[in-house]
Amino acid sequence: MQRLLTPVRQVLRVKRAMQEASFMPPLLPPAAHQRFSTVPAVPVAKADTWPKDVGILALEVYFPAQYVDQTDLEKFDNVEAGRYTVGLGQTHMGFCSVQEDINSLCLTVVQRLMERTQLPWDSVGWLEVGTETIIDKSKSVKTVLMELFQDSGNTDIEGIDTTNACYGGTASLFNAANWVESSAWDGRYAVVVCGDIAVYPRGNSRPTGGAGAVAMLVGPEAPLALERGLRGTHMENAYDFYKPNATSEYPLVDGKLSIQCYLRALDRCYTLYRQKIEKQWKQAGIERHFTLDDLQFMIFHTPFCKLVQKSLARLMFSDFLLADSDTQSSLYKGLEAFRGQKLEDTYANKDIEKAFQKASLDLFNKKTKPSLYLSLHNGNMYTSSLYGCLASLLSQCSAQDLAGSRIGAFSYGSGLAASFYSLRVSQDASPGSPLEKLVSSVSDLPERLASRKRVSPEEFTEIMNQREQYYHKVNFTPPGDPNSLFPGTWYLERVDELYRRKYARHLV
C-alpha cells in the first residue's frame, strides 16, 4: 500500500510547491466553488496591445459575363410592365451557365485579388469562405481554393467555409478580424471570400436571382476599419427561406415572412448597435441619441433594391420614435401622427411604410443609393450582396468624399442570423494612400458591367433548364464556350464518374 501511495504523495508535493511559488492558485475551499468563475476580473489584453484599425485593405468583385434584362423578362413572363423594374427596383440580372459553379467563382475572385494586389501567396495565413451554394456536403470550397496556393508551398492557412444563408460572408469577415486581433495571429494577411449563385424556379421569385463573388484582404492599418465593440447581432429560428432538398438548387421561400424577418432583425440589430455606441459615447462624456445623422453612408444586404429603400425608411422610423415629440426638425415634419407606435406592431402598416419612405428619400439618395449600383445591374449575390454594395459605394464616390466617414452595414441571412456594424474610413485620401488605392481598384465597376453580353429571356430560360439537368450529374463536360467568359475566369472543365471536379482558367 505504501508503494501505491508514494506517486500520489509526490504529485501533491509538486502541486504544493507550485502553489507556494505562485505558479497556480491554491485550491478553493468548498464554499468558494459556487462563486468560482473563469471570467477574469479585468480584460486579459489591453486595448493598446491590439493591432490598430483592423479591417478591409483591398477588395475584388467578380460577376458573370452575361445578364438578362428585367424589362425583357417582364414581357417574357407576361406580367405587367414595371413589376420587376419598379416593384423590385431591378434593371438587370446576372447569371451563370453550367460552366460556372461556386468553386469557379471563388477561384476567379481570389486569383484576381492576389494579382491586383501583387502579394505573394505565402503572405496569407487565413482564408475563409462564406457561401450557401453547396455542391458537396463534406468538401469545402476553401479546400478547392488551396489549389491556388500549391506552387507557393503555402499550406499553413487557417479558416474554412461558413454557412447560414446570406450571412456567411459577414461571419467570415468577423472571424478573419478576430484572428488578426488574436494571440494566434502570425503577422500575415487574412482573405475573406463570399460568393453565391442565386437561382429560383420560373415564377415570381426568379427575377430576384443573381450571381457573383467578392474577396477581401483583411489586416491592420486598413482604410476601412471595423469599429471595435460596435456590433448589434440578432439570431432566431425561422423558416423564411431554406434549402432542405439536396437534389435541387432552388430554395423554399415564404416571401412575406422573409421580408418581415428581415425588417424585424434590422430593428433589433439597429437598437443594439445604438445602445453600444451610446454607451461608448457616455463613457466619453457625450449624452445624446445615435441616429442616421451619425452615419455618412448606409449599406444593406440587398435581395432586391426596393427592400433596401424600405429598410432605410425603417431606420428613420426607429430614430423618430426616440426623438423628442417637440423636436422641430424639418426631417419629421408631418409625421407626428405616428408617435407612440411600437416597432414590433408596425411591420404590416403601409401608412407608416409610405410616409417614412417619402420622408427619407433625400437620406436614401445620399447615404444608400450609390451602394446599389451593382445590385441594380446584377441582382442578388446572397453572401456577397452586402460587400458588392460596399464595392459599389467605393466605385461611385471619390476618396475625398469617403475620407473620415462612418459606413453603417446591415447583414442578414435567412433562418436567421443578422448583424449591424460599422466601418470607419481613413482620413487620408491623398494620392497613393491606401484609401485612394482601394477606391481606384473598383472604379472600373460600371465599365465592367457595361461590357457584359445581353441574353434573351429565351436563352436565359434554356440555360436555367440546363442547370437543372446537370445539377448533381456525373461524368460530363459542361456545355458552353469558355470564350464567352471574361478573360482570366476559372470555369468547370469536367466532372468525372466519381463527382470529382476539374477546373481550368480562361486565358487572361
UniProtKB/Swiss-Prot annotation:
Active-site residues annotated for this sequence: 132 (proton donor/acceptor), 166 (acyl-thioester intermediate), 301 (proton donor/acceptor)
GO molecular function, one term: hydroxymethylglutaryl-CoA synthase activity
Family matches, as InterPro entries: HMG_CoA_synt_AS, HMG_CoA_synt_C_dom, HMG_CoA_synth_N, HMG_CoA_synthase_euk, Thiolase-like
Cellular localization per UniProt: Mitochondrion
GO cellular component, one term: mitochondrion
Residues where N6-succinyllysine is found: 52, 256, 310, 333, 342, 350, 354, 358, 473
Superkingdom of the source species: Eukaryota
Phosphoserine modification, residue list: 433, 440, 456
Keyword tRNA-binding: no
Signal peptide positions on this chain: none
PROSITE patterns linked: HMG_COA_SYNTHASE (PS01226)
Residue positions, PTM N6-acetyllysine: 243, 256, 306, 310, 342, 350, 354, 358, 437, 473
Pathway given in the UniProt record: Metabolic intermediate biosynthesis; (R)-mevalonate biosynthesis; (R)-mevalonate from acetyl-CoA: step 2/3
Transit peptide: 1-37
PTM field: Succinylated. Desuccinylated by SIRT5. Succinylation, at least at Lys-310, inhibits the enzymatic activity.
Binding site for (3S)-3-hydroxy-3-methylglutaryl-CoA: 80-81, 166, 204, 208, 258, 301, 310, 380, 414
Family matches, as SUPFAM superfamilies: Thiolase-like
Catalytic activity: acetoacetyl-CoA + acetyl-CoA + H2O = (3S)-3-hydroxy-3-methylglutaryl-CoA + CoA + H(+)
GO biological process terms held by the UniProt record: acetyl-CoA metabolic process; cholesterol biosynthetic process; farnesyl diphosphate biosynthetic process, mevalonate pathway
Principal subcellular localisation of the protein: mitochondrion
Keywords for the protein's UniProt record, in alphabetical order: Acetylation, Cholesterol biosynthesis, Cholesterol metabolism, Lipid biosynthesis, Lipid metabolism, Mitochondrion, Phosphoprotein, Steroid biosynthesis, Steroid metabolism, Sterol biosynthesis, Sterol metabolism, Transferase, Transit peptide
NCBIfam families noted in UniProt: HMG-CoA-S_euk
Family: Belongs to the thiolase-like superfamily. HMG-CoA synthase family.
Function summary: Catalyzes the first irreversible step in ketogenesis, condensing acetyl-CoA to acetoacetyl-CoA to form HMG-CoA, which is converted by HMG-CoA reductase (HMGCR) into mevalonate.
Complex and partners: Homodimer.
The protein, known as: Hydroxymethylglutaryl-CoA synthase, mitochondrial
Originating species: Sus scrofa
